[in-house]
Amino acid sequence: KAISELDCVSSLFVCGSGSDESTSIGGCYYLNRKNKNNKYLKNLFLGYDINNEIDKIAWEPICRDYIVRHGVTYSVVASLIANGNIIAKIDGRAEFGARALGNRSILADPSKRDIVMKINEAIKNRDFWMPFALSILEDYADKYIYNPKKLKAPFMSLAFNTLPDSYYNIYAGTHPYDKTV
């Protein structure tokens, strides 16, 4: 965040995973640039495809504790979230890196102050202090975050300050210490 706020920075790219496992991606980018290929990752959906595994999953034990629905529309998911439900979304290829980018995600209403505790209780061994990262549609980002340089964060690897008027609408997706997303 501090680097993005420097006056001399007008654009910034941060790999979707800032750990040792992303060294291989850095090597690929280095060779890509050196060889002038100009091919870049469009997404980080690099893992296995759940749609190829769906018939191999033992659903019975899962269905004892959870309601499992296949082929649910976005409007149904939105309605479930609006009614206070927590959704585990699994679709397509698994994401590489530190963030769930939509294919393996927990979806919930970020304006509910108690939702973080409910999710942490549902996910055993999750530390209570770990923040959740928000997914915000690009067209609505200016309503929630301060980003005067219009920096892109497609892999959710940049932090932004929240706007004071919208903080409580996205409370559960902000860092508890500094209210960033």
Language-model regions, residue ranges each:
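Flexible beta->alpha loop and helix N-cap segments adjacent to enzyme active/binding sites
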Residues: 2-181
